[in-house]
């Protein structure tokens, strides 16, 4: 009798769980969200200041160098000059894109366009459509 009750309880609980509506996920544009004064806004502002403090010419140096163009500044060290050159540049473009979508900050927009214009210049110099900062990638 006890086993039958347990089985019945299990069947009822699982069927009730299945009867509930599954949560619906939908995407929305980042610009539809505005952060209020909070730790989240402070974190966003910290990130904004950090990405604008980076020197875009140093992040572009590997791409320009591989394209046969003269860089405007030396590469950053560590990841950017030991075989993964240009790696951070891709993350940087993503960060700028998301920050602009979230804030509409014109300095971020201008920095993003500068990065894209310079990468396009490197791409044109290579002539194959490829853009690469890793040594020997072309």
Please annotate each region the language model reported.
Residues 20-138:
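Glycan-recognition and catalytic cores of secretory/periplasmic carbohydrate-active enzymes
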Residues 1-21:
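Bacterial Sec-dependent N-terminal signal peptides
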């Amino acid at each position: 009798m006890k086993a039958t009750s347990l089985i019945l309880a299990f069947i009822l609980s699982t069927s009730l769980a299945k009867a509930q509506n599954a949560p619906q996920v939908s995407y929305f544009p980042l610009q539809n969200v505005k952060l209020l004064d909070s730790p989240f806004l402070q974190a966003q502002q910290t990130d904004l200041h950090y990405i604008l403090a980076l020197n875009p010419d140093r992040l572009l140096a590997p791409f320009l160098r591989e394209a046969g163009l003269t860089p405007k500044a030396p590469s950053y060290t560590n990841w950017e000059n030991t075989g993964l050159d240009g790696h951070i540049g891709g993350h940087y473009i993503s960060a700028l894109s998301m920050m602009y979508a979230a804030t509409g900050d014109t300095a971020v927009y201008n920095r993003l366009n500068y990065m894209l214009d310079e990468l396009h210049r490197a791409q044109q110099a290579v002539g194959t459509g490829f853009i690469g900062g890793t040594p020997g990638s072309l």
